[in-house]
Amino acid sequence: MAVQQNKKSPSKRGMHRSHDALTAPALSVDSTTGEVHRPHHISPNGMYRGRKVVKVKGE
């Protein structure tokens, strides 16, 4: 098992963890229906950029 040679200082520890923060996912609003969805993904009702691209089961 790997064992460190020297103790990592608090500064270096913080730098190591600097990319671990969680961010909220970006959301877009569909211009025609007002549905909220992730950017570059279809909305839950099957619309993408104002066009119907997927037939949803409930319709």
Curated annotation (Swiss-Prot):
Region annotated Disordered, chain positions: 1-59
InterPro entries reported for this sequence: Ribosomal_bL32, Ribosomal_bL32_bact, Ribosomal_zn-bd
Leader sequence residues: none
Name of one Pfam family that matches: Ribosomal_L32p
GO cellular component annotations of the record: large ribosomal subunit
One GO MF term attached to the UniProt entry: structural constituent of ribosome
Compositional bias (Basic residues): 49-59
Keywords: Ribonucleoprotein, Ribosomal protein
GO biological process terms held by the UniProt record: translation
Annotated NCBIfam families: rpmF_bact
Family under the similarity heading: Belongs to the bacterial ribosomal protein bL32 family.
Protein name: Large ribosomal subunit protein bL32
Species this chain originates from: Neisseria meningitidis serogroup A / serotype 4A (strain DSM 15465 / Z2491)
Lineage of producing organism: Bacteria, Pseudomonadati, Pseudomonadota, Betaproteobacteria, Neisseriales
